[in-house]
Structures are given as C-alpha cells and as structure tokens.
Amino acid sequence: MCSSDLDAAHVKHSGTARTKEEADTPVIVSHGLKLGLVSGAYGLNGSTPPKGKSWAWSDIEADHLIKRAEAAKKAGADIVIVAAHSGLEYHHEPTGEQIRLAQRLTASPAVDMVYCHHSHVVEPWTRMNGKIVMYGLGNLVAQQSSNMPGTDEGVVGRVTFTVRSGKVSTTKAEYIPILIGSKNDGPIRIHAVDTELKSGMGNQARLKSAQQDISR
C-alpha cells in the first residue's frame, strides 16, 4: 500500500512524503477539534531515500518530531499526537531509547500524546509528564507467523481529551483488546475480544488467553 492508495481511501497519513511541499505541510484531521498527526521511524529497513530527497521520510529524532508538532499547533491543531516507529520486535517491554524519546516528546507543550509501533506485540502504557504514552499496540492489519507468540494480539486505544482555554488534558484512556483471526479459517477477521467472550462467539479459549495476555 502506498500514499496514493491511502488518499483514494480518504485516509490521512504522515511520516512519508512525495514532495517537499507535502513534507512541510502539517497533517491535520478536523472533526470538531483539530487533531495534528506527526510520525517518525527509526529507519527504512535498509533502504535509503532517493538522492537529494531526505525529506521523503521522517525520522524519530526528538527535536525533529517536536519541530513538526510545533508546526502542527501553529497550523491550528488543538491536539497533536506523535507516532514513533520504534522499539524492539516481539519484545513486550519498552527499550531505553523508547523511554528517553517519550520523555523528550512529552516534555514539549506541543505534544499531547505519544504512541509507538514496530514491536508487533502489545507493550505497556504509561503517563509521562501528564500525558499518555503507549509503547506498543500489537498488530491490527498485519498477520505474521504463528511461530511468533503474541503477534496475533493487539489493542485499539481510545483516549478522551479535554481542551479548555487552549490547554489540553487527558480525561480518560481505555484499550479494546483485539485478536487477528487465522488465515487458515478463511478471510482474516479482527475479533473484539471482550465482546466475543461475552456473547460466547468464536474460540473462547483463545479469546480468554488473548485477554489475559493483553491485560497483564
């Protein structure tokens, strides 16, 4: 999937750019309040941007991400969320690098929340400098080898913000545990763990196991 596919589906995206102008334009979603989206990645899996086009991707250097967050606020965003492609694959605990990055980002008035992805498994959430940090959400649309425990589990975050006189606070942070169905069972489905456990649907033993894994 590429940027044009996301555009066609009317899905906002950040972190990569096709032009310098696109790279310099803050990504803002308007739905009542205006939400700014800032993304960065630790690397490109061995690839490099085209020569002379370093702007084509955004790294996770803290000052760089804070500068982008400040630009989003200046462009009118009420709330700015930073997504950092960071961490260690298949490890359920945050790395020192993730923690240090979160400390830097949440110390900035321009950043209101941080979430990380890359580990492909669920990692802890915490509150830092009064702001929510999600170190790992697991998987949502990626189905990996069953030899990697936990990669079929994930969470959907639901965060409630309150904005008063331009000041942002986090009122509530909740998670919805999910389980990715096996491709051996037919079309891949996303299962809402709590809902299906209550209704008696699906593989109850596996759903219960996922619920316990995610909540620990």
Tell me what each language-model feature is.
Residues 2-216:
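Acidic, metal/ion-coordinating pockets
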